[in-house]
Amino acid sequence: MELFSIRIQRTFQLVSTIEAYDENDLKCELGTFFPSLQAYVYRAAGEIYAILGEQDKATEFYIKSQYYSIQLKSDFDGVKSGIVYSFRSVSIYSLSDLISNTITVCHPSKMNDPFDSLFLLWSSESNLNRICKNNAHIKPFSDSFQYFKIRSFVGNKKLSLDNNLIRKVVMWSHYADAHKGFCIRYKLSTVFIKQAQGNGYSHKYLKRVHYLSKNEKCDILTKKKDTNSLFIWKSTEWKYENEIRLISYDPSCKDDHLQIPLDKNSMIEAIYFGYRCVESNVKNIMQILGEGVQYFKMDYDPNNVYKLKVNKILYKDYIDT
């Protein structure tokens, strides 16, 4: 008991020191140098508060721990701007992003594959109860994960322009409503690629998905999992996607979806309309975005019908000016 009291005292001394910096808006600068220390201290404080029965306080400190645990995690820190692609069906949700100039992230439970992210399986209360001896901290710790949201894109290793990604028939079939949808080409600034925000302990960053080989196994029975790894490992069956993930952590949003505004240096550069996208949808999207965006229409290649062609189309040919 005496050792536990000493641990409490030392942990709270460190918490007081770190919070003093946080309150003076120095958290991001400090996080650049030793984010692992903040993550560890806040997590220890969360565990202590949970043992003391203060669940709300425990959740508060676990949230702060999550913020620091994902610092310095972007795969593209040296990229000044990056190109990513998003295949979409024509829906109220996809059109809303175009109208509001936002990118919507969602809770991993809303993704099409229930095994899409280790996050859901490992951080569940049932799994944590299975692998942890003490369970006082499990609910607040598990609750701190609910504010993670993700958005999937397609991109190459350098985040550069790549029409080969657009020509993949399977992507149009699976993610663009059987070629009736469209694909957005985004240019994202370095600020959008990785950004920690002020007082709200929110953070977002781009990460490349890694695919496990057929001989590799991925278990959820390990006590310690790097938060980063919970979002980036997928089965090798998905390797064809070339997936890039935008991972967002925002404790201020309790909904399953969050619209993130594009900053002034990020933009929609181009729209690619699917081979079966009807003209009314083409016109509607053009009217939303205007003439400042490039437009293309997918078509089959008569020399190879299993490979798509990218044909440029003009705004003025569809919209009366």
Can you annotate each of these PLM segments?
Residues A44, E60-T321:
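Partner-binding and oligomerization surfaces adjacent to conserved cores of proteins
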Residues R7-R10, L14, F61, Y68:
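Alpha-helical solenoid repeat scaffolds, predominantly canonical TPR units
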Residues Y21-E29, S69:
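Alpha-helical junction/boundary sensor with strong preference for TPR arrays
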